[in-house]
Amino acid sequence: MDAFVVLVFILSCLFLLSLWRQSSERGKLPPGPTPLPIIGNFLQIDVKDISGSLTNFSKVYGPVFTLYLGMKPTVVLHGYEAVKEALIDHGEEFAGRGSFPVAERVNKGLGIVFSNGSRWKETRRFSLMTLRNLGMGKRSIEDRVQEEAQCLVEELRKTNGSPCDPTFILGCAPCNVICSIIFQNRFDYKDKDFLTFMKKLNENARILSSPWFQVCNNFPLLIDYCPGSHHRITKNINYIRSYLSEKMKEHQESLDVANPRDFIDYYLIKLKQGNYNQQSEFSPENLATTVSDLFAAGTETTSTTLRYALLLLLKHPHVTAKVQEEIDQVVGRHRNPCMQDRSHMPYTDAMIHEVQRFIDLIPTNLPHAVTCDIKFRDYFIPKGTTIITSLSSVLHDSKEFPNPEVFDPGHFLDKNGNFKKSDYFMPFSTGKRMCAGEGLARMELFLFLTTILQNFKLKSLVHPKDIDTTPVLNGFASLPPSYQLCFIPV
């Protein structure tokens, strides 16, 4: 009985504390729906379609509003103007990484994606500089992507035109590009260690987008005390880091300071220069987390986009025909596509942009946070407040993209058929926290897709009108439904 009384007392205190905090904060923050104690507005959100819920709230409360996901307030920015004003015009103030409890437990504030403050700035600066040294944006990295594109084609030829699920083949190509940058070598697509590595990355992407993960992320107590798929993320990341640690040991044994071969070498040299001390942001642990971040961010996003692109091309064969006609005219059959071709292929460029716009891969972006107290549009947002930016509301803005729910490369073409840029195109986010690998990802999408379409006719197992392109998961990421197709050599 005593234990029951204590439990009731504790819950009552939490209830009253929640009421007090919410009432005192809500007067200063942007408007929003009235939250319930402890759980906040969570029951008013569809965890299977968070971006849709945010759109509905914006119709009532405007482009800047507050939600309580649990007991903490989160400010939501909806629409191009609000997102641009925050992430670009006030980029420094909105450059923090917001609350993401599962990742915080795994990464412990390390790495390039979920770190903050000076650690994030130093790690990001070093990573960008090293990627440039390794050829990012230069011909050398393009050579690697072209080489991998040919390996991808050879692997697809082995299917002999039979039905296949392209998930793992399309995942191997971008992963191998990252492998060549991180530890200099690529893997055979049938390598057992490589396939296990790929499987862990793919499983984590699915779990991150599950409704249960959204629940755990908003109620962190569940992470430690409840069973569920979220524990698989920790196990998978520990496996990936263990694998990477072995690579780091191999690099330490063969390191030549005068001739760095890859990202790991550059980082180990940084440590040898005496920068690894109690105050330094550089450490072996941060290296392992940073490399793990680069793999997670650089593999699954690109492979999912490729997978979705092929599904959309199957659904819209007239688009596929136009792209292949342009490839025949500009590239031909006797050489490999290169990045110089892109400026002469407006329809293909528009198709790839439209794929990224239409699929809306990361609908609510990774959470941001304000780095200081800030007055934003006459509202007061305290330092550390989590900020959600709805990329869906930008990529599917009907004023910029007429009929935004329709897949149409014409969204990125002018009346003369020339490629047309749009400030609303931000699948890689924007501002200080925008994707560090945007240039590489765009290169991979162009070279992999054009090389596939140069060499194969895509054949669906069902009629195009029966192909469903609705994402099966729409939490953290929009993932396409599973499907099979035939790659018919041409």
Curated annotation (Swiss-Prot):
Main location (coarse class): endoplasmic reticulum
Gene Ontology molecular function terms on file: heme binding; iron ion binding; oxidoreductase activity, acting on paired donors, with incorporation or reduction of molecular oxygen, reduced flavin or flavoprotein as one donor, and incorporation of one atom of oxygen
GO cellular component terms given for this protein: endoplasmic reticulum membrane
Enzyme class (EC, first level): oxidoreductase
Gene Ontology process terms (BP): organic acid metabolic process; xenobiotic metabolic process
Record membrane topology: Peripheral membrane protein
EC number annotated for this UniProt entry: 1.14.14.1
Record's keyword annotation contains Transmembrane helix: no
Database matches in SUPFAM superfamilies: Cytochrome P450
Keyword Endoplasmic reticulum attributed: yes
Name of the molecule in the record: Cytochrome P450 2C26
Organism: Mesocricetus auratus (Golden hamster)
Gene: CYP2C26
